[in-house]
């Protein structure tokens, strides 16, 4: 059986992540319209899956973020203006990758403080991006407050999921590093077995 190339592996992984984002975002948005109908809040899985993708694939995380934003707007019956604000404003999430210029991605998995900082910065950059994209239509500082407040449940959900998933092997890990690690472990295991007479 022919082995996958790194590029093929990345494409498959990103496709799965985007499909998961689309399905769960549609379910969450549809459910929120009933459960949170009297509250100025929504819950989204897009932030969670985008954070996981950023750790795994860096800037390719723009894919699930765009998909999630598009599906949210589609299911919630958004206007063209809202499509623009959410789909393009959410791309500001990538600014939180600057955190990894100073801190190892491994810290997201091992340190709660770093994990919280990473998710919070991603969340805030998304809110700021949406606000900036809304400025051509309406200049108001109240808008950014609304963006931050309405998605607060999504922030909490993302922190909880990433904390629960931190021990899942390879899930919250840079995939290039992960593949190199498991290949090294495989070689070491083969060497150990070759010296074992039994």
Model regions and ranges:
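Seven-transmembrane-like multi-pass membrane architecture, highlighting hydrophobic TM helices
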Residues: 8, 59, 69-70
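Alpha-helical transmembrane segments
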Residues: 21-22, 94, 155, 159
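Alpha-helical transmembrane segments and their membrane-interface exit regions
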Residues: 48-50, 89-98
């Amino acid at each position: 059986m022919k082995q996958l190339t790194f590029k093929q592996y990345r494409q498959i992984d990103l496709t799965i992540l985007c499909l998961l984002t689309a399905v769960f975002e549609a379910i969450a948005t549809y459910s929120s319209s009933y459960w949170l109908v009297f509250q100025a809040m929504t819950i989204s899985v897009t932030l969670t899956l985008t954070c996981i993708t950023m750790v795994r694939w860096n800037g390719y995380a723009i894919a699930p973020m765009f998909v999630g934003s598009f599906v949210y707007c589609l299911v919630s019956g958004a206007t063209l203006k809202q499509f623009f604000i959410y789909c393009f404003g959410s791309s500001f999430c990538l600014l939180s990758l600057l955190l990894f210029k100073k801190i190892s991605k491994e810290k997201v998995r091992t340190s709660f403080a770093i994990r919280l900082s990473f998710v919070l910065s991603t969340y805030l950059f998304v809110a700021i991006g949406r606000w900036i994209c809304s400025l051509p239509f309406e200049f108001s500082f109240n808008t950014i407050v609304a963006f931050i407040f309405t998605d607060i449940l999504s922030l909490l959900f993302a922190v909880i999921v990433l904390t629960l998933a931190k021990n899942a092997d390879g899930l919250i890990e840079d995939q290039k590093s992960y593949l190199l690690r498991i290949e090294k472990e495989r070689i070491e295991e083969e060497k150990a077995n070759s010296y074992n007479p039994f």
